[in-house]
Every structure is written in structure tokens, then in C-alpha cells.
Amino acid sequence: MEWIADPSIWAGLITLIVIELVLGIDNLVFIAILAEKLPPKQRDRARVTGLLLAMLMRLLLLASISWLVTLTQPLFSFRSFTFSARDLIMLFGGFFLLFKATMELNERLEGKDSNNPTQRKGAKFWGVVTQIVVLDAIFSLDSVITAVGMVDHLLVMMAAVVIAISLMLMASKPLTQFVNSHPTIVILCLSFLLMIGFSLVAEGFGFVIPKGYLYAAIGFSVMIEALNQLAIFNRRRFLSANQTLRQRTTEAVMRLLSGQKEDAELDAETASMLVDHGNQQIFNPQERRMIERVLNLNQRTVSSIMTSRHDIEHIDLNAPEEEIRQLLERNQHTRLVVTDGDDAEDLLGVVHVIDLLQQSLRGEPLNLRVLIRQPLVFPETLPLLPALEQFRNARTHFAFVVDEFGSVEGIVTLSDVTETIAGNLPNEVEEIDARHDIQKNADGSWTANGHMPLEDLVQYVPLPLDEKREYHTIAGLLMEYLQRIPKPGEEVQVGDYLLKTLQVESHRVQKVQIIPLRKDGEMEYEV
């Protein structure tokens, strides 16, 4: 054990650790790029597993030095080339590295979103770990042969490997986060891997490329990229000092909507700033929902937000005055629909409650006929934006919705259109609009009104909807699936959710329970 006190041994250990780290940088870069393909919860485990297997592999190779030496002995010749086992391993590793780096570059340059879970379905944990281990084997062979040529003591070589791998484990997570958060650095690292792969292939054919040339090229590229990252940092600091990220994001969206392209560079800069902003939200959830609703406003028709004629509170034109007064006492609306008789389908117009009150205050008998006003008439296929414009031009807030035969299907108000953007706006005496009634239950399910519009439902429950559908409510969805009126207790599976009919009155679906399902199709809880 006298060698422990030998300064040359310690110098060799330190030198060997440095060399192991230098030779392991390319391995770390490859691990960083591969680990990013996995779901976030598996990335750390993949990195640690890959590096620990690399350490185990290098220790096993060091323990079998006598076998390792035989790898450099010639196996066969082909024309002017002589190949050993080490040369074949270098060739395989070089071609594998060239293939993987080329595929990764193609994915990045073709614009595939590596953060999109739908494009990352093929990334399996052990598949990624296997690729890491294959590259570890190739890089381990190179580093172990270097160690054998520098130090004579096996324990020193093993200690250097353990220390180097431990340092790489500590640096792997921040390196992975840094590399994958800067797209230009990812491209640069993949270019390095191409260079290293090419050098391995050349070395396998017996053409020795001095490592100094490779490291000089890599070092120069890193220096240029460092200057580039510094310039980007200064530019972002300048932009942030003049405008908040929220303002810049808003301007970028508005330029995109207006079709302006002259500030594309600034928009790209804003997008990069958003990526670097992490998980912190620039806009709160209410603002994001409102923006989404505004952008989808012209995709919805008045029939999707109207109040069905069956839910309209109406008054008979010939009703006695006492009945009118009783209706006014319990009424919660500012307008009443006037019908000719008790038939809710024969709508004559609307009267304003305030007009009736003024008539009563003047001591006049209540006369509905002279107070009737004609509302707007919308076809049921009218989009909401033109409807909003008609409300503005006509200076009225009320409209009848009719089908192609002229039959009144329901009513729609300016408040209905406003709620499509801002969400439900209940008045002082109204807890919540029944058409938008949805509550989340303690067991994780939802209870919704059957007449709730599907466009509002998907804000809470992400049901898959057919863009060409001819129905607009939950009840319509159930009837489309069953091809008849549902019965209480009947269930329909839509995507990952089970829709259970709870209440049906007069052939109308009143309440529906929406139950989330597990991926295997079973309920997440007992109903």
C-alpha cells in the first residue's frame, strides 16, 4: 500500500478524473437529449440509471484488463484495412451515433414539437435507457483504454471512474435542463455528436484524427454560442425593461391576428421569452378562457345559446289583469313574451315590464296589446358575431330564433351573447342560469343540466365533439348516441367519460351525471 503515499499516484488520479470528465461530456450531452424524450417523471430516473450502468460497465471492463488488451489485436483484414474488436466497436458506435444525431437533427429542423405528448408516445423508458447504455459501452471502451495506458494501479483507475461518474451525475440534471431549454444549443450539441460519430468511424478504419482538433472545433463553437446567448440575454433584458412580457405577448398575438409579418423576429423573441418563463402563467385562467371564447365566437350559432321556447316564461295576450299582476310579482325578467292564448308556439312579441309598471302607476288598466314590441328575428344558423352586430344596429337586446320554416325555436338576448364571452352573469335574484348549471361532485364526477350547451360544457369536461354535429346540448348529444329519448339511469360512453341520465321530465333530459373513466374503461370510483 506504499503507492497511496506516492504523489505521482494522486497526480495520476486527478489527471485521470479530468480525462474521464472530458471524455464523458459527449456522453452527457447525448443523455440530456435522449432523456428529454421521456415524460418529466421518468427523466431523472433514466439519467441516473444510464450513468450508473455506465459506471458498472467501466468497472467491469477495468476488472477484466487482460481481456480488454485482446480487443486491440487484429481479427481480420479487408484490402488495406486491418480490423480489431475495438475497431469494430468503434465503427458500430460511430454509425449508431451518426444515425441518432441525424434523426434528432431532422426532428428539430422539421419543427416537430418534442414537448407535445402526442408526438412522444413512442419514447419508452427502457428503450431510452438501452440507447444510453449502447453509447455508454462505446464511450466506456475509449475511456478505459485511456485509463489503462496512464495508470498502473487498478484501484486508482476504479476510483477515478467512480468519482468522475459521481460528478457527472451531479451535473447531468442542470445540464439537461440547460441544453433542452435552448434550441440552438441542442442543435450545436447534435452537431458535436455528428463530429464525434464521424471521428469514431474514421478511427475504426484506422485513420487517427487527433482529439485536439475535435476539441478545438468544439471549443470554438461553444465560444461563439456563448456570445450568441449573451446577445440574446441582453436583448431580452432590453425588451423586458421597455415592456412587460404580458404586453409583448398581447402585441404578438394582435400582430398575428392582423396578419402583420414585419415584426416576426420580435414575435419569435417573445415566444422564446415565454418558454424561458417556465410554468408561471402570463395570463390568468379567466383571461385565457375569455380569449378562447372570443376566438370561437363566430363558430357558434344563436341556436347553441338560445333559451328553448319550452323554457320561456310567457303571458297570454288576453289574460285578465289580476293574472298579469301575479305574474309580475313572481317574474325575474325585464321582458315578457306575449302569446296568443296558452300556445307557447304562437309568439306575438315582447313587452317590457317597466312599461307595464308605468301603465299601472298612471292608474290605467293593463293593456298588453298597446305595449307589444317586435324583437329581432334571427335564423337558427346565424353566427354570434353577425347577431351581435344586429343587436348593436337595432338598439334592442331581444330576438326570436326561427327555423327554416319560420317556426320560433327560442329566444336569445344580448346578455346571452355576452355570457358566451364572459361566462355566466347571474342577476341579484338568480343564483345561476339553469342552461349553464354544472357542479362538480365530491367523487370527481359532474352533474349538469341537460340543456347546457356543449361549447360551455367542454370548458369543464373535455369531451370529444364532432364539428359537423347538428345538436348543441348535452341532451342532444345523448339522443344522437341513443337515437331516441334517454331513460333515467341509461348510460352512454363519450370518449373517456360516461354520461348517465339522472332525470327526464316530459320527454326532456333535465339532469345528467358525467363520470370520468380510467384508461382501461373502468370507473375511477363506484357509482
UniProtKB/Swiss-Prot annotation:
Gene3D superfamilies: 3.30.465.10, CBS-domain. Residues 306-366, 371-429 form the CBS domain. SUPFAM superfamilies: CBS-domain pair, FAD-binding/transporter-associated domain-like. It comes from the Bacteria. The chain crosses the membrane at residues 14-34, 51-71, 81-101, 145-165, 185-205. One of its GO terms (cellular component) is plasma membrane. It holds the Pfam family CBS. Keywords: CBS domain, Cell membrane, Membrane, Repeat, Transmembrane, Transmembrane helix. InterPro entries: CBS_dom (IPR000644), CBS_dom_sf (IPR046342), FAD-bd_PCMH-like_sf (IPR036318), FAD-bd_PCMH_sub2 (IPR016169), Integral_membrane_TerC (IPR005496), Ion_transp-like_CBS (IPR044751), Transptr-assoc_dom (IPR005170). GO terms for molecular function: flavin adenine dinucleotide binding. Its main location: membrane. It is found in: Cell membrane. It is a multi-pass membrane protein. Belongs to the UPF0053 family. This is UPF0053 protein YegH. It comes from Escherichia coli (strain K12).
